Regions:
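Non-heme di-metal
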Residues: 1-315
Length: 315
């Protein structure tokens, strides 16, 4: 059995830190903590009403997919990874990841609630797993891996969900950012994008550095490439990016570029050797996050340290 999975009687206490590399991932995530209420959506509704019917359809379904997917990710975290790992540092990371995934889920629900006024239509967005076949297919792939694979292979599949299944959708929203519209959506997208990249990198780091019995390169490629085919179908056929004016062939190339990057991180050879086709993706996420945090008012305090709690208050 992998050492990280062997029962550890000291798993309930974090000190002394024994795995500093894992602890650093936790501290990085802690430093990047944000809340859905920080995102200003006040200007988005005007832009939303100016979108074409096709553009609205695309954004609604992307948000529906994201809202459903975070629930699946959380189930894997809560039901499996958090329970299985015995290093307290890893439990800390999965704990904060679970909290952030909840914030992502709330963010997507707030976005849908803000943009979609028709209650029946809104309900369809909130129940995408029941109503959208394209979302169902991706969900089935993820759930099959969650329920039926070894810990080692689930790390690879989890990286595929975070790194491939979300990548086309993230990219399409950044495309809207490059057009100067939907600022609130784009700010949320930038923050979630960076969170999910960290989650993906953590799964890869665990496999590369804390797992002895790693899946073969052939198996890793099989998992990633099967996820790639589903994502290509989703973002270029089931919910084509052409609806918002993007080039589907370039999106396929972008997804192949993403998969090559993941393969290299896993220590495997590239499969496609393609270039990044979207120049706007190179800096936009970093710039958006920086601008967002710079725009915060100085009065905002995450922990509200300036507030005092009176123990005479009613609870």
């Amino acid at each position: 059995m992998e050492k990280i999975l062997v029962e550890n009687p000291n798993r309930f206490v974090i000190f002394p830190i024994e795995h500093n590399d894992i602890w650093e991932y936790y501290k990085m995530h802690q430093a990047a903590f944000w809340t859905a209420e920080e995102i200003d959506l006040s200007g988005d509704l005007r832009d939303w009403e100016n979108l074409s019917e096709n553009e609205q359809y695309f954004v609604k379904n992307i948000l529906s997919f994201f809202a459903a997917s975070d629930g699946i990710v959380n189930e894997n975290l809560a039901e499996n990874f958090y329970r299985e790992v015995q290093y307290p540092e890893a439990k800390f990371f999965y704990g904060i990841q679970l909290a952030m995934e909840n914030i992502h889920s709330l963010m997507y629900s707030l976005l849908i609630d803000t943009y979609v006024s028709n209650e029946d239509e809104k309900n369809k967005c909130f129940t995408a797993l029941d109503n959208l076949p394209a979302v169902q297919k991706k969900a089935k792939w993820a759930l099959d891996w969650i329920e039926n694979a070894s810990f080692q292979e689930r790390l690879v599949a989890f990286a595929a969900v975070e790194g491939i299944f979300f990548s086309g959708s993230f990219c399409s929203i950044f495309w809207l950012k490059s057009r100067g519209i939907m600022q609130g959506l784009c700010n949320a997208n930038a923050l979630i994008f960076k969170d999910e990249n960290l989650h993906c990198d953590f799964a890869i780091h665990l496999l590369n550095n804390h797992i002895e019995n790693k899946p073969s390169e052939k198996r890793i490629k099989e998992i990633l490439l099967s996820a790639l085919e589903i994502e290509k179908e989703f973002i270029t056929e089931s919910l084509p990016v052409s609806l918002i004016g993007m080039n589907s062939n370039l999106m396929k190339q972008y997804l192949e570029f993403v998969v090559d990057g993941l393969l290299v991180k896993f220590g495997c050879k590239k499969q496609f050797n393609v270039e990044q086709p979207f120049k706007f993706m190179e800096q936009i996420a970093v710039e958006t996050k920086g601008n967002f945090f710079e725009s915060r008012t100085v009065e905002y305090q995450k922990a509200k340290l300036n507030e005092t709690l009176s123990f005479t208050d009613d609870f």
